[in-house]
Amino acid sequence: NKKWYDSTDVIASISKVTYDIVNNVSPNTENHYVPHAVQDDVFKKLPKDDVAGFRADNMGENGKDKMIFFWNNRNARRKQSGTLALWFSEFAEEVGPENVCLIMHTDPKDVHGQDLEAILHDHDYDDGRILISREKVPPTHLSMMYNMADVTVNISDAEGFGLGTLESLSCGTPI
């Protein structure tokens, strides 16, 4: 890639490996290490008792034994929110909708997305298998939501680096 590195004014390397490669292959090219990051004092594995209390406060007795899936994205077409609702509902029918819950943390009526409330209502997905979390919350609350989830779901088309993926993994929640 030397010819490409040499033809570039500035390279922003998102990993130390890339930074070292560029520096070795093309030492005269301006190269900056700019890692993706989240607040590691906020997005981290939290104490189980705190998470259990948060889950009880937010999911109630009904959510105690459910497997929780978490989706935290803008409700934009490329994030495929409506498709996710369909796929999750099909999965819920296979395992029993009383056993699983998808929490979609998003604006359900984003002008660049789909009307999630209408989709849930029109397809009878509004029975508790899919919940919408629409309020803007501080990062500490969001971290608790990642910790409460058993798994984070992240599908999209033409994605950037995936901030939600990094936040979730930082909290110890698999994607």
Describe the function of each predicted region:
Residues 17, 37:
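Carbohydrate-associated surface elements
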Residues 157:
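Aromatic "clamp/platform" in nucleotide-sugar-dependent glycosyltransferases that forms part
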Residues 1-9:
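A conserved, positively charged/aromatic
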Residues 61-79, 85-88, 102-103:
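Conserved donor-binding/catalytic core segment of Leloir-type glycosyltransferases
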Residues 113-140:
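Nucleotide-activated donor-binding/catalytic signature segment of Leloir-type glycosyltransferases, i.e.
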Residues 5, 144-149:
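Short alpha-helical donor nucleotide-sugar binding micro-motif in glycosyltransferases
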Residues 38-57:
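Acidic anion/phosphate-binding donor-loop and adjacent secondary structure
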